[in-house]
Amino acid sequence: MERYLLVALGGALGSLLRYGLGALVQGSLGAGFPWSTLFVNALGSFLIGLTLRLSLEGALSGEARLFLAVGVLGGFTTFSSLSYETLALLQGGEVGKALLYAFGSLFLGLFLAFLGYRLGGALVG
């Protein structure tokens, strides 16, 4: 039961962080492109790579990994928003933006997850 509570609390925290940070980013960069989801998913990808490496190196307990990776980062990142916003761009006739957003999100996320993983290795030694 404790593990479920860790995931639930982490998910609530991650969702609140996504909402607040997303509003800040979108307000700063303006409408016309889903900057907030791109930013949040990119940051979350970096942090999941970092969390994975720290966990593999024994620097995080299993409970901390559940709280951070499954809870906080699971609530923080959002694939459903990426899908919705890509579809909205397509329906608006902005095919180029939609493709840039979808593929850019995927490649940026993978690249940042790799960087986070490498940073975790450097931090642990």
Swiss-Prot record:
This is Fluoride-specific ion channel FluC. The chain crosses the membrane at residues 5-25, 29-49, 66-86, 95-115. InterPro entries: FluC. Disulfide bonds: none annotated. Na(+) binds at residues 74, 77. The gene is fluC. It comes from Thermus thermophilus (strain ATCC 27634 / DSM 579 / HB8). It comes from the Bacteria. It catalyses: fluoride(in) = fluoride(out). Belongs to the fluoride channel Fluc/FEX (TC 1.A.43) family. It is a multi-pass membrane protein. Pfam families: CRCB. Keywords: Cell inner membrane, Cell membrane, Ion channel, Ion transport, Membrane, Metal-binding, Sodium, Transmembrane, Transmembrane helix, Transport.
